[in-house]
A protein has these predicted regions:
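ATP-binding/phosphotransfer module of carbohydrate and carboxylate kinases, centering on a glycine-rich
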Residues: 1-68, 77-80, 98-109, 121-131, ...
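Structural signature of FAD isoalloxazine-binding scaffolds in flavoprotein oxidoreductases
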Residues: 160-164
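Short beta-strand segments
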Residues: 9, 68-74, 136-142, 146-148
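A charged helix-plus-loop insertion that forms the helical arch/lid used to bind
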Residues: 82-92
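Short, active-site-adjacent cap segments at secondary-structure transitions
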Residues: 75-79, 116-119, 144
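Short loop/edge segments at beta-strand edges and connector loops
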Residues: 111-113
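Adenylate-forming
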Residues: 118-124, 145-147, 166-167
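Short hydrophobic alpha-helix segments
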Residues: 30-32, 87, 157
Length: 260
């Protein structure tokens, strides 16, 4: 039986974990809730405990059967894995790859910005296979971007390369983004941004809509489901969301000129 490896995608709502062959074949996947309270101190211990439990279930030994782990973090990551601040998780002054390695008995762990490593994965095994230059955008709790040129991740001097979610796209915004800016793409085209746009649209219109039954608890999924069903207000929300996403992607395309 060959060595295995582990992939960890830390999101603002959940952490998705996969067990793989070193060839990239997925053997199992599962997730745990992202506990962001108290500065996110429980996130990595929860991940480590979940990995140990899964390995035990499969009769695998952490030290003998696992070659290492790769981890995606929703924010800027320095080349050595250091994270100065990750607002979506509450982290400050943390090296998550060192901490997760410590919690997993010292196995090798490498971390990077989630969208960057997702783009790398797509180039290796997914929709970007066969391409040397690509841009990937991730839409979740936030908006991330990964840029690969000549098969190399463009992370930048401070790990901020590809932070597409914080491109300024909207001049009529008045609330601050998590990054401290105003008018960022993430404020309108992320899952949380879609829900917020829906609440704003409901507040300024008397138009009937299936979204009204959810009130302030409306989610991005509710909006998407209603839009697919032809709900006029939901379609209006998605038109706004898509407009700003397209505006940002056009800027990126003109800047880096990717193949895909």
């Amino acid at each position: 039986m060959g060595m295995k490896c582990i992939g960890v995608d830390i999101g603002g709502t959940s952490v998705k974990i996969g067990l793989f062959e070193t060839t990239g074949e997925l053997l199992d996947k599962w997730e745990v809730k992202t506990r962001k309270e108290d500065g996110g101190v429980n996130i990595l211990p929860d991940v480590a405990a979940s990995i140990r439990k899964k390995l035990d279930e499969k009769g695998l030994d952490l030290k003998k059967d696992v070659a290492g782990a790769g981890m995606g973090v929703p924010g800027p990551v320095m080349p050595d894995g250091y994270v100065e601040v990750c607002v979506n998780l509450g982290w400050r002054d943390l090296n998550p790859q060192e901490e997760l390695s410590r919690l997993l008995d010292g196995i090798p762990v490498k971390s990077g910005n989630d969208a960057n490593v997702a783009a790398l994965g797509e180039m290796w095994q997914g929709g970007g296979k066969g391409y040397s230059d690509l841009v990937m955008v991730t839409l979740g709790t936030g908006v991330g971007g990964g840029v690969i040129l000549d098969q190399k991740i463009i992370a930048g001097k401070h790990g901020l390369g590809g932070e597409i979610g914080h491109i300024h796209v909207r001049d009529d915004e008045w609330e601050h983004c998590n990054c401290g800016g105003v008018g960022c793409l993430e404020q309108v085209s992320s899952a949380t941004g879609i829900a917020r746009e829906a609440r704003r649209t409901m507040a300024k219109s008397d138009k009937p809509s299936a979204l009204r039954e959810f009130g302030d608890n409306v989610s991005a999924k509710d909006v998407l489901d209603a839009a697919k069903a032809g709900d006029e207000m939901a379609l209006e929300v998605m038109k706004t969301v898509s407009h700003y996403l397209g505006l940002a992607l056009a800027q990126v395309a003109l800047t880096v000129d990717p193949e895909i």
